[in-house]
Amino acid sequence: MGRRMLLIAVGGLGLGRGLGQEMGAGTKPDVTIAPKSTAVVSARVIDAANEPAISAQEKLQLIRRRIKYVFVLFQENRSFDFYFGSYPGADGLYAGPSGPYASGQVAGFTQAIVNTDGTLGTVTPFRIPATVTDTAGKTVPLYPADIASVNHSHVATARKIALDADGVAQNSEYALTEEGVTLVDGKPSKVPTLERKQFGELVMSHVDCDTVPFLWRYADRFTLFDHFMDTIVGPSTPNAIAMIAGQGGETQWMLHPDAATTGGIGMGATVPMLSDPQPYWGSALDTAQQLKQPQALHTFGGVSKNLTFASLPLSFMGSTIKKTTARDYDPAFDLPDVQEDIEKIAGHGVSAVNWGWYQQGYDREKNDPDAKATHDGYVAHHNAPQYFGYVANNPVATTHLHGLSDFFRDVAAKQLPASGVFYVRGGYGNIEGWKPQDPNPRLATVFNGNDDHPGYSDSQVSEALLAEEINAIASSPYWSQSAIIITYDESDGEYDHARPRIRSYDAAGLPLEQGPRIPALVISPYAVAHGVSHVPTEHSSVIRFVDEVFTLIPLADLPDEERGREIGKKDFGQDYLGPADDKVPGVGDMSSAFDVLRLQGKRAPLSAAYAIIPKREIDAFPHDHGDGCRVLGITPTDSGLPNPVPSDFNPRPDSTPGIPTAGGWTP
């Protein structure tokens, strides 16, 4: 009874609070236009306030008429503030849509950090410089495109956001959590090593348009979302699953309470998902002889349960759902928790929706040495559909799972179906053979990943992949009917000042949903040019957009998911356990990114050429010669402010240890 009483005590707190305390939520338009840009961009800008006033339903009908393809370019592990914290016009570290922030206005801006001598100091956000000067006067390059990964476990992230007694995130424990230190009466529990202190500094860092000019170019030309949150407080796998399910398994937890987890990596066989286990399908536990799914060469974190709650791949089956699920190899194992969902989807009268999940290394890639797939770049715990038996254990459903090379081949050959939803992911290494700028030969094989995950991916290699994907779409007939959504699974545990709104808690009473802020952009011929959307959004908003465009029943309205939610209300005092594509306040959709005049045909759509980045620029590292802000004509909001880089800062404390300014450090 004690655990349930805890959940009742905290479950209703925080909702409706903390969402926009820096942003002034509810006091500004959904979309504003960023400060003046180049002539190329300015010529395509219309003040959002001058758009025709139409109802949400009228706008949705226009979107349905124009958009037939939704592409989700799904990257890894960056906070919004890390990439866009100094983007003009957004709710950033130094300024918001209305101008600079006053001291103390940004949550967690100044954080405690313990020095290696045990004294207490502070750290504030800073931009990672391209170079520093060491004690001998030598210029030392830091290569900010290659940084270590900080702690993004469920427990660590819950500590970092630091809820107060009212359930409002203070975002004040990022540095101390990285150090592994707590303060008791102002005194540290232990003295951190140099490496741990450097991680405490790294978590507060950010970059700008000099490091990721392609990302800023897309934000400049199309629509950036400055309040898009991840769904689960925690790592990649639960948030990959949330991208297609709107939850991490809470309804499965409610239907099977003995499956609850208290968190911690290695405890994979539990729901809701809170760690990064490998999918059950393809693991050593999967003894089925049919449809053996691939596993990554590098595995950790145990093995997941078979996930049995509803997701978009189930909804995508549409009116053919009974015929499709009849092909499942083990329906008693895969389908018991969605029987009523299947009936409702079957009776909805909507045809099956085409879809595809394209992920590097899932099958043979173009850089594999022979006809056999090596799966060398495959990160299995990023492949959300592989966790669901009704996909991975069904010969019809698995035809929707592909490798990354397949995406480029299918788009170039015009082999996509007449409409649909398509997810695209990178992984370890990259199929183009791009090398990070850092000349260290060891790091060339450590940071050559293309999915943007710190610790193994290079930021510019990763934005190069995005550019190749967008170019492929823009060069195809699909461009004129497309909505391209770039977003991330989670924040990697990097500092972000926007307060997540906590609506649910796990079995241990730790915050479960929603998590920290992450980048999100919409690119489309019908997008608001140079816009910043301030609509509260998250992974479920992408699902909601897909629901709306393809007239699907929201996952939250399916009967088995409703049953799980009702158990959460009745037995655990929590109202919002389950999908958030409906019935959860404060979760908007992605429609604010679309220009009404363009949708109505009264203003020219944005051209494919406007979206394309030339191949020669993609292949030239560093992008824009490391001078992206000047090339783009953008002045970051920290321009002219002191950049308080800690004297012992190191962007890669684990792979290139030491102090760059001390002399003798190898990047």
Regions found by a protein language model. Give the residues of each.
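Terminal low-complexity, poorly structured segments
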Residues: 9-11, 15, 628, 637
